[in-house]
Amino acid sequence: MSMARGPATPPITKGILKLARQIDATSTPDYVAVEPGEDCLPGQCFENVAATVKRTGGSVQHGWRLREQPAAYVEGEFYAVWRRLDGNLIDVTPRPDGVTEILFLPDTRLVWEGDPVEPRRMMLNEQPCYCGSGMPFKICHGLAED
């Protein structure tokens, strides 16, 4: 059965793989099912996973939720999912957009400590940088493509 994907859950494209390698060359992106947890709130992945671990066991898996704006950019948002006792990853954070799976890149190097972590972005063309500098993104933020 195919899971519902929206603009927020891209196919695994060359752009996605390139961004994934820039973030963590040792991990591979994969799809993770969204199964909203008990009393979990949208937009609160770190708190939701911590509460789920406390209530049912398992552990927190930090990483990056990967998204693509076709023909514009790919983006990684620092994120947390629940690693069940059987090792499977589940996104317990409810999705108001109805998406039933996310594209997730595990990252064992970073741990959420309560402070925001800047998203990682890579332009797919010569679009101006999102920061408003007027420079091409890959020059402005040093993510020049090979």
PLM features per residue range, with description:
Residues M1-C131, M135-I139, L143-D146:
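A structural boundary/capping signal
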